[in-house]
Amino acid sequence: MRAVEWRGAPIDDDFVEIIETCVQCRGCEPACPSGVPFGRLIEGTREALARERTITPRWQRWAFAMLPRHRTLLAGSTMLALAQRLRLAPRRLGVGRLPLRRGPAVTPTGSDVWLFTGCVMDAWQRDTHRNTARVLDAIGVTYAVPGSSGSCCGALHTHAGLRDEAVELALGVMASMPGEAPILVNSAGCGAALKDYGHLLGTDGARRFAARVFDVHEWIAPRLDAVPDLRPLGEPVIVQDPCHLRHVQKAHLPVRAVVGRFAEVIELDDEGLCCGAGGAYSALQPELAGEIRERKVATIERAYERSGATVVVSANPGCSMHLQQALAARGIDVRHPIDLLAAALP
């Protein structure tokens, strides 16, 4: 990979296939005894391949270009949701059932923290933003929301090798959330991207910005004593760790601390096995993504057999929607941990 990225080594079809079929879950990093940063190696290699137009087809570039155009994304998402209801949307897109109505956006209440709303998360799971706001209200924290220039973190662009586009989006995100207030993110993929801006941009300002970023659970968990009377859920909850929360941010334990305040936590026995969503991977490699998902579903079913739990929590929109496609028919619901926490508020 370094030879391709740095020295322009020849690229053949076999090499491209290897890179294209990597889900970029980064599960190899904690397993590697030498600590090789495979994630950054893959990103650098994909950047070199993208420059050669060997990967990242034109339709994918077009789709990614729509992400920062928030109104266009919202309109397109509504059209896709309607197409799903009419059975006109191909399942190979790898997109779970989208909401026809998403309700109002979060209204800022102050400036204690920033709540990063993102692009896909706001278009497809806006309820989770409103529930995050409810939790912050209960804790007694005010929040600001970035403007439209900070609506896309660039994570998918980075994964696709589109570094120039990712840098441009990162600069917009940083400009949209100035100051020193903490930045809370309720999407694991977005949080990992924002925390990596120091590496992406290589500036002191970007490193200071990245140091302000927290996954919402790691920030909320030590502050939940401010809400002492949470209502018990009444059933156990299976926790599924998004790869970018567990392997990249290493912030998966606070999810258990949050969920454990109102429900019994049920662990999976797969040591953080990827679910196969991988950002855009489920759309680009639907067969492989489906095979990976079936392995994950098998571990969830084992947890269900042990505990009777019919609720799975996952703190990333891609993971939750990808899993819900397979688990809905089995009577298992996939939710965001913050949604359950909001339901437990007194």
PLM feature segments, named:
Residues 1-17:
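N-terminal cysteine/histidine-rich coordination modules
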Residues 12, 16-36, 272-273:
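Cysteine-centered iron-sulfur cluster-binding motifs in ferredoxin-type domains/subunits
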Residues 38-346:
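Iron-sulfur cluster-binding electron-transfer modules in prokaryotic oxidoreductases
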